[in-house]
Amino acid sequence: MTSPAKFKKDKEIIAEYDTQVKEIRAQLTEQMKCLDQQCELRVQLLQDLQDFFRKKAEIEMDYSRNLEKLAERFLAKTCSTKDQQFKKDQNVLSPVNCWNLLLNQVKRESRDHTTLSDIYLNNIIPRFVQVSEDSGRLFKKSKEVGQQLQDDLMKVLNELYSVMKTYHMYNADSISAQSKLKEAEKQEEKQIGKSVKQEDRQTPRSPDSTANVRIEEKHVRRSSVKKIEKMKEKRQAKYTENKLKAIKARNEYLLALEATNASVFKYYIHDLSDLIDCCDLGYHASLNRALRTFLSAELNLEQSKHEGLDAIENAVENLDATSDKQRLMEMYNNVFCPPMKFEFQPHMGDMASQLCAQQPVQSELLQRCQQLQSRLSTLKIENEEVKKTMEATLQTIQDIVTVEDFDVSDCFQYSNSMESVKSTVSETFMSKPSIAKRRANQQETEQFYFTVRECYGF
């Protein structure tokens, strides 16, 4: 004899769901902390780069002895206890690789210290300042969008909880109604059997003396049977009604379950990736431009520098947002990995885990399917248009941040008049009218890009 199957109680199902949601909520919180940490590390990196080139400009004026001191200073800083965690977390990212190579290159510098100092102060440092400002601004916007995405995801999870509770309630009502119906059926069978036994046990009497008694007894039995039949009909109707509600509630639960899993998958697989892309929007390209400016100056130095500069150039070539994003997600895999899918939890022996397409819910499901197909067709057309707009906007931003304006070879075209050379190299990076116009266009395009992102999601 097999033991009866043990079903999970409502409290157990709710507790498991709450635990899974709490884990997701904790993961979402850690994601924001991780992005905040990356922003802080990036700001620190950019600040270090600014401090580095500012100090380097001063040292260029004091020749190679002071250049050696600069290299030792920053190498010691990166090896200090305070920066151990920073180095551990960032040693695989391409910008940090460039930073380490720059420190090694300092020992090789030995030419035209006045020109290099002027380029460092009036060209490279303003670029890092610009990158820091842009990065902070974009991160703030990205964080707002990310918070909204997380709020939307939690809203979906809360809606699933509500639908699941409704399913439990209606399924419990259906089971209760079924139990009452079975009880009425048993009473009916019992009453019918009792009536048959009473008729069989009656002793023969004369027609004249027992006619009235038999008629009265039959009337009483029929009345009792009719009452039970009426009660059975009511309970049958109640059971049918509750069963239909339970089926509809289960269908809603299954649909909500599928939608929730799709939303969770979309957030972890697509939205997080896009969110990190937004945080990095233009960062690597702008850093690439700043470091290429440095390379343009350094490549005009003595031939003895070429080996070190080639190594840095290779690192700059490898500045890649996609690779760094992949490394970041691998380093924090437990934060960015998708959670387990929500599984259907059968309630009180209800083992049907598929949508019920039988009458009387078939027509309703067909109508809903048609509505969803129509809506999906409309959304597909809209999304194609939005995708084209996003690609065009993103390409515009990429064109702005990848403009090749890092060549400073003209600064090394010496003439008999050093004043003319100084006048040429002293024109600061931020003072050019075209730069200001391009900056305005960049910010306007960024604003439009995020507006579209916020309206249509990731």
Swiss-Prot record:
Comp. bias (Basic and acidic residues): 181-203
Listed InterPro entries: AH/BAR_dom_sf, F_BAR, FCH_dom, SLIT-ROBO_RhoGAP
UniProt xrefs under Gene3D superfamilies: Arfaptin homology (AH) domain/BAR domain
SMART domains hit by this protein: FCH
Residue ranges constituting the F-BAR domain according to the UniProt record: 22-324
GO cellular component: cytoplasm; glutamatergic synapse
Record GO biological process: negative regulation of cell migration; nervous system development; regulation of synapse assembly
Coiled-coil features, chain-numbered ranges: 362-400
Disordered as annotated region, ranges: 181-214
Key words, A-Z: Coiled coil, Neurogenesis
Known role: May regulate cell migration and differentiation through interaction with and inhibition of SRGAP2. In contrast to SRGAP2C, it is not able to induce long-lasting changes in synaptic density throughout adulthood.
Note: This is one of the 3 duplications of the ancestral gene SRGAP2/SRGAP2A which has undergone human-specific segmental gene duplications. The appearance of SRGAP2B in the human genome is estimated to 3,4 million years. Two larger duplications later copied SRGAP2B to chromosome 1p12 (SRGAP2C) and to proximal 1q21.1 (SRGAP2D). SRGAP2B was identified in some individuals but it is not clear if it produces a functional protein.
Name of the molecule in the record: SLIT-ROBO Rho GTPase-activating protein 2B
Organism: Homo sapiens (Human)
